[in-house]
């Protein structure tokens, strides 16, 4: 059985903010659509290979960098939970994981 993908409200909001930023910055959604596809494809790979990410601070949380974004997640045999998507160009002191 395939793992279920669960997005925390914070992670989903992170994704929307990132995509909106690029829509507004560029003036169209070409780049944001491509970025969204990249992120979703990567998450599909995490379902198959959940240990790809590096363990975060001796917790069950893992982190994987994709382009300029850190994707924080945890997993069990039944689900993959996306916890946060962080733009690495932002101030790391604001990271709430």
Give the location of each predicted region.
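Short, Lys/Arg-enriched, disordered terminal segments
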Residues: 1-4, 95-97
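Enriched for short, Lys/Arg-rich terminal
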Residues: 66-70, 74-97
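Basic, Lys/Arg-enriched alpha-helical interface segments
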Residues: 2-60
């Amino acid at each position: 059985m395939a793992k279920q993908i669960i997005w925390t409200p914070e992670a989903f909001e992170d994704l929307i903010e990132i995509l909106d930023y690029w829509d507004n910055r560029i003036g169209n959604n070409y780049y944001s659509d491509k970025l969204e596809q990249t992120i979703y494809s990567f998450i599909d790979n995490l379902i198959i290979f959940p240990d790809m990410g590096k363990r975060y601070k001796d917790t069950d949380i893992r982190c994987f960098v994709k382009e300029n974004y850190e994707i924080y997640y945890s997993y069990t045999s039944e689900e993959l939970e996306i916890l946060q998507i962080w733009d690495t160009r932002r101030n790391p002191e604001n990271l709430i994981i």
